[in-house]
């Protein structure tokens, strides 16, 4: 295979190597799936010595095809049969359907194993369309029934998104999209199929619309009832994971949060005046026993969907950028709770920041946040039997840890939003 993948991959939204200098991109494994469709694993090397593996499905055509779109064009390659054009196959409905059919038939081709979950049938004849919503993976929607998520950056080991969705679905938890199938090699997961949440709305969009309505008039859109339902859904998922996979007790992760604080302070010097107080808050918990079990790991309002029936939690892959073993490590459910509480603050205050920081808007944003935090925690407590705020200092520490991470991110990539986490840090350490 002589395709110049390097020039193509650096422009993909899911490519994670933008901060490093690319050294080489080479096919590590190519598996023919029939009909001009190749499954390709790419080894990407960087000049700093680090490496990553990416997954691409290549559809070969004898001549250019307009229907794919510019983003799908990988390049051309010459061979005994002449020059052929290569496209990202997920943008081809027929090729995507062929992949779904392999999963539906639970086939094995070379090193690739396709498997369908028991007692389900996949909509192999449904029209396929690539979703534009994701950054790190690529999803294809089949009609109104199923969604195929293809992992772009693949890592050896058990994929937590497949693992936890399977556990929750088989336990009958109603707050996840049912896992329908998957495909993998002997060493790594490559993709999964879940039931598609048709007619759903993302929690972030609903929350920011509520805040926008609030700023537009005194009555505003009220999100508190939905926050209460969301709290109950999160508690339900936590309970199922704890009951199914077990719990244990460990110490508060003092070394991890202190290292994150040091790293973030280098990236965001604005943290420096607060660093001693933050460190003191963390160190007070150094010997604190923490109940842990498997959790979502990267929960926020962009990771939840409101369907006509209920809230669904999606994308159980864990915190982006963390090693797989860290993403699968049991953690406190308060980390997920803190992620949602931080998301409430972002939903409210990002409109204050973009609106020029008007004090009256800030006061109304604070009221909106407080109302939705109260509702979420009440919904959580109704299922879990305890309000997460009863853990006081521990919950605040997880919120601080998240806000410290956010401050470093905003300082690097979105400085105009840095006041959002800084405002929260000031409040939490006071």
UniProtKB/Swiss-Prot annotation:
Pfam families according to UniProt: Mak_N_cap
Pathway, per record: Glycan biosynthesis; glycogen biosynthesis
GO molecular function: ATP binding; kinase activity
Enzyme Commission number(s) from the entry: 2.7.1.175
Species of provenance: Mycolicibacterium gilvum (strain DSM 45189 / LMG 24558 / Spyr1)
GO BP annotations listed: carbohydrate phosphorylation; glycogen biosynthetic process; trehalose biosynthetic process
Record keywords: ATP-binding, Carbohydrate metabolism, Glycogen biosynthesis, Glycogen metabolism, Kinase, Nucleotide-binding, Transferase
SUPFAM superfamilies referenced in this protein's UniProt entry, alphabetically: Protein kinase-like (PK-like)
Keyword flag Repeat: no
Complexes and interactors: Monomer.
Described function: Catalyzes the ATP-dependent phosphorylation of maltose to maltose 1-phosphate. Is involved in a branched alpha-glucan biosynthetic pathway from trehalose, together with TreS, GlgE and GlgB.
Protein name, as recorded: Maltokinase
Domain of life: Bacteria
Family statement: Belongs to the aminoglycoside phosphotransferase family.
Catalytic activity from the UniProt record: D-maltose + ATP = alpha-maltose 1-phosphate + ADP + H(+)
Gene designation per UniProt: mak
């Amino acid at each position: 295979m002589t395709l110049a993948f390097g020039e193509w991959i650096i422009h993909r939204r899911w490519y994670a190597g933008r901060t490093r200098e690319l050294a080489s991109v080479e096919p590590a494994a190519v598996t023919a799936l029939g009909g001009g469709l190749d499954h390709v694993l790419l080894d990407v090397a960087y000049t700093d010595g680090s490496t990553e593996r990416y997954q691409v499905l290549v559809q070969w055509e004898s001549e250019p095809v307009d229907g794919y779109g510019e983003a799908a064009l990988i390049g051309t390659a010459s061979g005994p049969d002449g020059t052929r054009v290569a496209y990202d196959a997920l943008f081809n409905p027929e090729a995507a359907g062929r992949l779904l059919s392999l999963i539906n038939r639970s086939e094995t081709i070379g090193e690739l194993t396709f498997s369908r979950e028991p007692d389900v049938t996949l909509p192999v004849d449904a029209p396929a369309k690539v979703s534009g919503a994701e950054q790190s993976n690529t999803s294809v929607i089949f009609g109104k029934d199923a969604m195929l998520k293809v992992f772009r950056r693949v890592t050896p080991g058990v994929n937590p998104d497949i693992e936890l969705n399977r556990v929750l679905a088989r336990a009958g938890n109603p707050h996840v999209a049912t896992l329908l199938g998957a495909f993998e090699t002997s060493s790594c997961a490559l993709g999964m199929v879940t039931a598609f949440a048709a007619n759903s709305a993302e929690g972030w969009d609903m929350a920011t619309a509520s805040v926008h309505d609030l700023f537009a008039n005194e009555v505003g859109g009220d999100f508190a009832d939905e926050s209460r339902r969301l709290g109950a859904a999160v508690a339900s998922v936590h309970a199922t994971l704890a009951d199914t996979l077990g719990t244990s007790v460990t110490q508060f992760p003092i070394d991890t949060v202190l290292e994150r604080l040091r790293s973030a302070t280098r990236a965001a010097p604005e943290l420096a005046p607060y660093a001693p107080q933050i460190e003191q808050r963390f160190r007070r918990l150094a010997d604190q026993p923490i109940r842990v079990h498997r959790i979502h790991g990267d929960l926020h309002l962009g990771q939840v969907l409101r369907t006509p029936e209920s809230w669904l939690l999606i994308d159980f892959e864990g915190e982006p950028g963390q090693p797989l073993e860290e993403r699968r490590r049991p953690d406190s459910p308060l980390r997920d709770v803190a992620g949602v509480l931080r998301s409430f603050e972002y939903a409210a205050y990002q409109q204050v920041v973009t609106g020029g920081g008007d004090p009256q808007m800030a006061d109304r944003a604070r009221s909106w946040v407080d109302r939705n935090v109260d509702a979420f925690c009440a919904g959580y407590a109704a299922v879990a039997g305890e309000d997460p705020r009863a853990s006081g200092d521990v919950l605040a520490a997880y919120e601080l840890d998240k806000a410290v991470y956010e401050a470093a991110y905003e300082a690097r990539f979105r400085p105009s939003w840095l006041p959002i986490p800084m405002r929260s840090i000031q409040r939490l350490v006071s």
